[in-house]
Every structure is written in structure tokens, then in C-alpha cells.
Amino acid sequence: MQILEEKPKEGKVKVKAETLDDLWHLYHIIDPGDIVYAKTLRKQAQRADSLRAEKVEVIPVFLGVQAEKINFHKFANQVRVTGPIVYASREDVPLGKYHTIAIEQGTVVTIQKPRWKEHHIERLKEAVAASKRARVMIVVIDDGEADMALVREYGVEILNSIRHNLGGKRYNTDRESEEMKFFHDVAKTMEEVMKRENVEKAIVAGPGFVKEDFYKFLKEKYPELAKKVVIEDTSVTGRTGIYEVIKRGVVDRVYQENRVAKEVQLVEKVLENIARNNGLVAYGLKEVEEAVNYGAVETLLVLDELLKGELREKVEELMDAVRYSRGEVVVVSSEHEGGEKLKALGGLAALLRFRVK
């Protein structure tokens, strides 16, 4: 994401959304009541004379819409902001009528807030920093099967699954030929995805020796791709293997600033502390609020959905209190396994400096 202009006195920030991740950030930055300005298309009835029917035209116009509904449409690659029009660049567009602004990759949008809160500013900074980082690709590979995923800012996107029937014994000539075809398919797919998505690193993992064989193959046949590959172990294959790579901190080691890896690891730490019953964790609104009041929270985990729901104001108060006591606040995406686990805990959890009970 690019910040094009800032007007602090007016509470306005003008940005350009460049990636799907930027749309995810904007979905969490824009709140009900904010005014969103952008170029858009609007159907407008054009008056005709008494002999001809009224004609509807689609006109380009610059509008300001006061947000009432904000929806993230991942598969359409859009954030849709719906609300009454409060500003229009054309006099023939009536104010007060409802309109939906569709924010896509490449859209320039101005967001005006009565007050920019700390978590809004943090997410905006994150989005700008993330635009300078490459994403990470994960490939979990074993005999004749490879599962691929991209680790994005908003979560894990499962990509291609490649399956080849390699036949019988490991050192059979036909099997070796089929394995070479399989390796070529995986390598070509990796090249395509990494080029398209601007990925600098790929983690190739798996439970057996196939990953090492594949890496040797890459060094011989695809040397440039091999330079971007890191080899790791997993205990399983498939999607479970992909999430194992993330949980074990492999992504974090490969690309330390990756948001998803940090979120998943923190949720896992919460679950570990719960299992140990060591008193250094709180979860659910009541427990977390008590820990915040004691100044005991070292890290507060907040599910992103709570910042769009009825508890938003209460949760924001807790976030501000934790920051005031020099704690860390991490907003966890609901789009990955860690977010699902946090949701099961009520959407709020805290790692504590000391026991409060």
C-alpha cells in the first residue's frame, strides 16, 4: 500500500491499494461512520423530453460515502463500502442517496475519520511495510504428491495440489522417469507462482527423503529456483503439513516479519499455557479484562472480527489500556487456523507477566 497524502487536521489519509493484502488491511481500517472518497461509477437517470422514456446512464463520478456497511469479498478481490453519499463532484448526483464504492487493487481512496486510533495507524504502517516485503511460498512434498500455499498478510491461501502416480519400487526405471516428470511439474508451478506473486523465498518441506531428492533435482535443472528454496522437515504431508511449517516457526525464520507466522505461534503459546495450567494466560472477555486491570498483560491477542462487532468499543478500551501499560497488542486474522482457535476461546486472550489468581 502507498500513502499518497495525509491531512491530519482533517483526519484524512489518501492511499493506493496495490495488493489483495492491502484490501484486507483497508477492510479493518475503515469503520462505520468514516467517510470514504473515491472515483466510482454510478447509474444516473437522465431526463428526456415528453416523447421519450427516461434513460439510465452509467457515469464516472468522484464520491464521498459515509460508511455504514464494510464487506471484504476475497474471491471478487474487493472491499465494498456502502452508505449515503455526503459529497459528489457532480451537481446532478443527489446527496443522501445510497451508493457502494468498490475498492480494488489499484484503487486510490481517501479515508476520513473523526479520530485515527492507535490500531488503525499500526495497521496502516503494517500495510505500507508489507508492500515492501515479498510473500513466502510453502511446498509440502512426498511421493507423487505436492501441496502448495502462499502465506499472505491476511492468512494462508492454499494453492495447487499436484498428484502423480509414480508406480512401484523406488529404484524402478519407470518410477524414476515418472518422478522426474513430477518434479518438473512442481518446479514449473513454483516458478509460475513465485513470478506472478513476487515471492522471494519458498519453503520445501516433507516427512521423508523426497524433499532432498527434489532439492537436488532443482539445483541441477532449475538452479535459480533452487537459490530461493529452504528445506525443512514435517511429520505429515498435505494441508496439515503446511500448517505444521507455520506453527514450528519456519516461516518466521525464513521471513521474520511475517504476520501470520507470529499470530499462529502466539495462539499456540496461549494454548500451551492453558494446557500447563500455569496461571500465565487469560482468555475470554471477563478474564482478560481482569488481567488488564491488574496491568498484568504482556501480549493481548484480539480476533479481528471483534473490531467489527458489538464489543468493538470495549475491546478498543482494553487495547488502549494494554498499550498504556507497555504491553503488546496483536490483532489476529480470522482467516487462518490460529484465528479459528482464538475464536473458540472467545476471540480474546492474553499472555501474562505475572499471575493474577
From Swiss-Prot:
Gene Ontology MF terms in the entry: endonuclease activity; metal ion binding
Metal-binding as UniProt keyword: yes
Keywords, comma-separated and alphabetical: Cytoplasm, Endonuclease, Hydrolase, Metal-binding, Nuclease
Superkingdom of origin organism: Archaea
Principal location listed in the UniProt entry: cytoplasm
Role this protein plays: May function in recognizing stalled ribosomes, interact with stem-loop structures in stalled mRNA molecules, and effect endonucleolytic cleavage of the mRNA. May play a role in the release non-functional ribosomes and degradation of damaged mRNAs. Has endoribonuclease activity.
Domain-level remarks: The N-terminal domain has the RNA-binding Sm fold. It harbors the endoribonuclease activity.
Family: Belongs to the eukaryotic release factor 1 family. Pelota subfamily.
Protein name: Protein pelota homolog
